[in-house]
Design a protein with these regions (language model features):
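Helix-turn-helix DNA-binding module
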Residues: 73-90
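DNA major-groove recognition helices of helix-turn-helix
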Residues: 91-109
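Short alpha-helical segments used as structural interaction elements across diverse proteins
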Residues: 14, 27, 65, 90-92
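Short, amphipathic alpha-helical "recognition" segments used to contact nucleic acids or chromatin
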Residues: 62-75
Length: 124
């Protein structure tokens, strides 16, 4: 598992969350007017729990609103950004910190290997 995989699954999370929570091995979604079969890796079944843990641990209601709307409900960044009193850079900083915290939880539970962490380039 690497950070790019996590980001890709976060982009389609609203379309696959019911299948993940139902314990299915895959889901069919529509992407670019095509039906696509998405296979779920083992670590993905922890994602809903981690998201809820992060939302419960945060005190900022604006942050929880952003994550619920953009990740869980599947609204676009543009739609969510128009509804919150934040600058664009602050909005994306919140989302980046959320992704980092999710990745750290996967590391803590052993889903990310040392080689995968070292393989990710800093200067890309």
């Amino acid at each position: 598992m690497n950070k790019a995989e996590l980001k890709n699954f976060l982009l389609i999370y609203d379309k696959i969350k019911d299948s993940i929570e139902g314990g299915k091995e895959y889901a069919y979604i529509r992407r670019c007017n095509r039906k696509q079969k998405i296979m779920f890796p083992e670590w993905l079944y922890k994602l809903p729990d981690y998201i809820e843990d992060i939302l419960k641990s945060e005190d900022n209601p604006l942050f929880t609103y952003i994550i619920r709307e953009s990740v869980i409900s599947g609204k676009t960044d543009k739609q969510t950004l128009t509804e919150v009193p934040l600058s664009e850079s602050s909005y994306y900083r919140y989302k980046r910190k959320f992704e980092e915290k999710l990745y750290e939880l996967f590391i803590a539970d052993g889903y990310v290997t040392r080689e995968e962490i070292l393989k990710a380039k800093i200067a890309d």
